[in-house]
Design a protein with these regions (language model features):
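Switch II (G3) loop of P-loop NTPases
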Residues: 108-114, 118-119, 130-152
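C-terminal lobe/tail of nucleotide-utilizing enzymes
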Residues: 183-261
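Inter-motif core of Ras-like GTPase G domains
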Residues: 128-137, 152-171
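Glycine-rich phosphate-binding loops of nucleotide-dependent enzymes
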Residues: 141, 145, 160, 193
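Conserved catalytic network of the ASCE P-loop NTPase/AAA+ motor domain
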Residues: 28-30, 98, 132-136, 156-158, ...
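Walker A/P-loop phosphate-binding motif and the immediately C-terminal alpha-helix
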Residues: 3-42
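N-terminal phosphate/diphosphate-binding loop that engages ATP/GTP or pyrophosphate donors
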Residues: 28-101
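Conserved nucleotide-binding/hydrolysis micro-motifs of P-loop NTPases
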Residues: 42-43, 111-113, 147-148, 170-172, ...
Length: 261
């Protein structure tokens, strides 16, 4: 199965929890399917949602100085000068990912100088890796993005099967969704959908529907004690993924149906 999904949303809406649950659910429903989860949000912690032990060291790709220097021919932290703009990255997902229950995690990291658009070795590696993951891998790739979609360029965005914007009933998350959709459209993402999270009532669902009438609503996730308690305990929710609520399973199946193969 080949499927490329990006998840965005205002901080605090539960985007990372939703992303991890979708990745785990797809892996469980399709035994043998390769699922790669990309943590591309500097403040996210996708590892915890996937159940990866916090003592297990994870070095973000942007901080692998020796690898970046080897592949680009330039020392990380430098700008300008000459370096390779199309570095070899096809071995990175297998070499530097951590696997748990059929999901491989890759942490992208942050370019510390120059901003996301800087012409520097670290940014070049991250861009090349995202291009490879979206365009060249015949796998399920689930991306936990920043509030925007900065890691995706125009060259890769057309191959993203869906940008899923996670919202709560609150107004601020819905306003943020409008901004994220504009960013997504600007770089060529065609399928942008809404996932309502932490919904407590039919009134919450109606509020999201009525305030976002020109969006496709993928589905709604209820406020769940299991998720709240697992966050307090520092463990992943639904240790037995077969116990996920039907709403989440239905959302995962809808997303899987977007796969071109």
């Amino acid at each position: 199965m080949s499927l490329k999904l990006a998840f965005g949303g205002k901080g605090g809406v539960g985007k990372t929890t939703v992303t991890s649950l979708i990745a785990r659910t797809i892996a469980a429903l399709n035994k043998g399917t390769s699922v790669i989860a990309i943590d591309a949000d500097p403040v996210a912690n996708l590892a915890a949602g996937l159940g990866i032990d916090e003592t297990q060291p994870i070095t973000p790709i942007a901080e692998l100085s020796d690898l970046i220097a080897e592949r680009t021919g330039a020392v990380p932290g430098t700008m300008g000068g000459f370096f390779t703009l199309n570095p070899k990255v096809d071995d990175i997902p297998d070499r530097f990912s951590i696997e748990k229950d059929g999901v491989k995690l890759l942490v992208m990291g942050t370019v510390l100088n120059g901003g996301s658009g800087c012409i520097c070795p670290e940014a070049t590696i991250l861009k090349a890796l995202m291009n490879h993951l979206v365009l060249a891998r015949d796998e399920v790739v689930v991306m936990d993005m920043e509030a925007g979609v900065e890691h995706l360029g125009r060259g890769t965005s057309g191959s993203v099967d869906a940008l899923v914007v996670v919202v709560n009933p609150g107004k601020r998350s819905r306003v943020a969704a409008d901004k994220i959709r504009k960013l997504g459209k600007d770089i060529g993402i065609k399928n942008i959908v809404i996932l309502g999270n932490r919904v407590k009532s039919e009134a919450d669902k109606d509020l999201i529907r009525e305030s976002m009438p020109d969006y496709e609503i993928l589905g709604f996730m209820p406020e769940l004690d299991e998720i709240v308690q697992s966050d307090r305990d520092g463990v992943r929710p639904f240790e037995d993924i077969s116990n996920i609520p039907e709403e989440l399973k239905a959302i995962a199946l809808k997303l899987m149906a977007l796969s071109p193969q």
